[in-house]
């Protein structure tokens, strides 16, 4: 008999010879149709068909857990591989990983040996995938020696698999299959092909084997997979909506920002975009002031010795930009925290002045490969709404709880109402003592629990210096965006020898909390553009009001209205072009102005305004003072 301990600490006994699937069907029947794999002792992930062979802590992985989702997507990649080889007998498979960002959730790189495959072939491949799903093949696993595996794949002419096997250090490899088809894989996989009910091939591109242009050019086919058709349909709806809402397209139409060939990955903010950028910064600055934050600014270029001291040199070197000044190495800052810590260290500190909260709109530069750049979502230069809080250890929980409240206040201001929260734990590449990591992680969990906020765990995805809370916001079409973070750091205060004098006169080490709510202003603006489809609420809109003249006779009246609105603090544009009013209206709709004032001789004679609200076709006649009062009320209530 073996003992399996569930997450709720209950212990179940399992007879020898039972598989994990047998165990779930007997002890956890409500999960039998959802279970995809199991994780033992927080580390080892196994197929449900594996036999229970030891006492373990066990987690059942379903599609809703990240590891279960990855198992599902990778199994769908195998489904694609099998379908392709059923249809294209000479096709050679290479690798088929799961991805977080891209035109799909998985892909398979395939050498079609001269056959041309295009998106027009997707229906044929999907039909073959459907046949495999309907056959409901059990997924089998076999462990063989490397020699056996090489001989097997040599007979099939699978040269890429042989190359992969040659690079595996262990003497045994695992093979997974469905029916007579099989593939080299370490697993795990779903229990049977029938689980993979809903899928879609989404894109195709070229890719070099091992990303080396001297190697063979392969065909990369992307796809997504879901447990139900409803979830797939929702995803496909999101994709179509996302195309309409693409912030790059809307940003161009509204003249918010651009990217230039002279600086790929570096945004150029146009006047309207700068208004939007400043609106976000000013709002957060005012909220920080209410909460006792002190704003600072740190240099963009600092000595490489600083980055070695902070640990960024070892952990972030490949993403940094370097320069030489007076024959010494310097770097553009990729993060703001070391500079902030130098400001803290510049003065002596007493326990009476802690917690000390510094805030900075800090511009950082990080090298990203050209191929992953994506509008405002993935750039090489951006501004973080960074805050670094230095506090005694016994203040950690209360500070974290205050930041949680602050974070949700900001998100709700922008119209977000649904959230998902995660705790990201210690990665393999990290710094600091085990006990500090355990204490910090426990404190983050307790803070969320006391606030009644449910959370998931992202194993090994914390920063190199500490665990973090990640805040995900759900936008208007149901997509989740990871934005804010709260990160606990014991490492940097140690590295910079930061201290304060406690009530007993002794020097103590503060804990450091890194906090960002937007994450970066650039990315958050990109999210807002797509969330609102460019139709911003009045208080942040860069195009609040456009005044359109019907005839040249009303130009002076329009200018008078324009000046009054400017003096009242509104963002106004005046269009007196000698164009038909219909053309002016169409142009204003494209720019997504909140209000159009259509002024003709009638409005001039009555000293009124014909007001057309965004998204409506009718106009209302308002007095000038009445319109201004309405705008002020709208902004106050937002």
From Swiss-Prot:
What does the record give as EC number? 6.1.1.3
Keywords for this protein:
Aminoacyl-tRNA synthetase, ATP-binding, Cytoplasm, Ligase, Metal-binding, Nucleotide-binding, Protein biosynthesis, RNA-binding, tRNA-binding, Zinc
- One of this protein's Pfam families, by short name? HGTP_anticodon
- Name a single GO cellular component: cytoplasm
User: What start-end ranges are recorded for coiled-coil regions in this protein?
Assistant: none
Question: According to the entry, what is the taxonomic lineage of the organism?
Answer: Bacteria, Pseudomonadati, Spirochaetota, Spirochaetia, Leptospirales
Return the cofactor note field: Binds 1 zinc ion per subunit.
Q: What class of enzyme is it?
A: ligase
Q: Name one GO molecular function term.
A: metal ion binding
TGS domain location is 1-62
Give cofactor(s), names only.
Zn(2+)
Q: Which InterPro entries match?
A: aa-tRNA-synt_IIb (IPR002314), aa-tRNA-synth_II (IPR006195), aa-tRNA-synth_II/BPL/LPL (IPR045864), Anticodon-bd (IPR004154), Anticodon-bd_dom_sf (IPR036621), Beta-grasp_dom_sf (IPR012675), TGS (IPR004095), TGS-like (IPR012676)
Question: Which residue intervals make up region (Catalytic)?
Answer: 246-537
Source domain of life: Bacteria
Please name the source species.
Answer: Leptospira interrogans serogroup Icterohaemorrhagiae serovar copenhageni (strain Fiocruz L1-130)
Assembly state and interactors? Homodimer.
Which Gene3D superfamilies has this protein been placed in? 3.10.20.30, 3.30.54.20, Anticodon-binding domain (3.40.50.800), Bira Bifunctional Protein, Domain 2 (3.30.930.10), Threonyl-trna Synthetase, Chain A, domain 2 (3.30.980.10)
Name it.
Answer: Threonine--tRNA ligase
């Amino acid at each position: 008999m073996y003992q399996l301990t569930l997450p709720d600490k209950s212990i179940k006994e399992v007879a020898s010879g039972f598989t994990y699937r047998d165990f779930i069907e007997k002890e956890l029947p409500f999960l039998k149709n959802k279970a995809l794999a199991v994780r033992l002792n927080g580390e080892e992930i196994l197929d449900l068909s594996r036999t229970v062979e030891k006492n373990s802590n066990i987690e059942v992985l379903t599609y809703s857990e990240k590891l279960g989702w990855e198992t599902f997507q990778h199994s769908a990649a195998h489904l694609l591989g099998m379908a392709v080889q059923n249809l294209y007998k000479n096709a050679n498979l290479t690798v088929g990983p799961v991805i977080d960002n891209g035109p799909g959730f998985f892909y398979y790189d395939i050498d079609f040996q001269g056959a041309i495959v295009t998106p027009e072939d997707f229906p044929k491949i999907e039909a073959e995938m459907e046949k495999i799903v309907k056959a409901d093949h059990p997924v089998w696993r076999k462990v063989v020696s490397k020699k056996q595996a090489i001989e097997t794949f040599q007979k099939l002419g699978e040269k890429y698999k042989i190359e992969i096997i040659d690079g595996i250090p262990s003497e045994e490899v695992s093979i997974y299959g469905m029916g007579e088809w099989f593939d080299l894989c370490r697993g795990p996989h779903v229990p049977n092909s029938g689980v993979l009910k809903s899928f879609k091939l989404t894109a195709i591109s070229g890719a070099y084997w091992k990303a080396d242009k001297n190697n063979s050019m392969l065909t990369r086919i992307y796809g997504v997979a879901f447990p139900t058709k409803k979830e797939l349909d929702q995803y496909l709806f999101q994709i179509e909506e996302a195309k309409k809402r693409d912030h790059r397209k809307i940003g161009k139409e509204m003249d918010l920002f651009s990217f230039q060939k002279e600086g790929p990955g570096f945004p150029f903010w146009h006047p309207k975009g700068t208004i939007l950028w400043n609106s976000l910064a000013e709002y957060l600055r005012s909220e920080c002031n209410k909460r006792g934050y002190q704003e600072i600014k740190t240099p963009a270029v600092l000595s490489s010795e600083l980055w070695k001291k902070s640990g960024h040199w070892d952990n972030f070197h490949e993403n940094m930009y370097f320069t030489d000044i007076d024959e010494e190495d310097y770097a553009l800052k990729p993060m703001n925290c070391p500079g902030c810590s130098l400001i803290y260290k510049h003065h002596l500190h007493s326990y009476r002045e802690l917690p000390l909260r510094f805030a900075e709109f800090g511009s950082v530069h990080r090298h990203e490969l050209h191929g992953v750049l994506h509008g405002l979502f993935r750039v090489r230069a951006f501004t973080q709404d960074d805050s670094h809080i230095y506090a005694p250890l016994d203040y950690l929980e209360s500070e974290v709880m205050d930041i949680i409240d602050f974070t949700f206040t900001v998100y709700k201001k922008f119209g977000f109402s649904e959230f998902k929260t995660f705790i990201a734990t210690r990665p393999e590449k990290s710094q600091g003592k085990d006990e500090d990591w355990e204490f910090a992680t426990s404190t983050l969990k307790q803070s969320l629990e006391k606030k009644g906020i449910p959370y998931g765990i992202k194993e090994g995805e914390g920063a190199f210096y500490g665990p973090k809370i990640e805040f995900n916001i759900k936008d208007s079409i149901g997509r989740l965006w990871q934005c804010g973070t709260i990160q606990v750091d014991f490492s940097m205060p140690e590295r910079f020898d930061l201290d304060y004098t406690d009530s007993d006169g002794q020097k103590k080490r503060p804990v450091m909390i890194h906090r960002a709510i937007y994450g970066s202003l650039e990315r958050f603006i990109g999210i807002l553009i797509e969330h609102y489809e460019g139709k911003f609420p009045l208080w942040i809109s860069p195009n609040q009001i456009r005044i359109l003249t019907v005839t040249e006779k009303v130009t002076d009246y329009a200018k008078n209205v324009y000046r009054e609105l400017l003096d009242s603090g509104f963002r106004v544009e005046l269009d007196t072009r000698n164009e038909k009013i219909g053309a002016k209206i169409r142009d204003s709709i494209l720019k997504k102005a909140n209000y159009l004032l259509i002024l003709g001789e009638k409005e001039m004679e009555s000293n009124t305004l014909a007001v057309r609200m965004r998204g409506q076709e009718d106009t209302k006649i308002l007095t000038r003072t009445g319109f201004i009062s309405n705008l002020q009320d709208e902004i106050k209530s937002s």
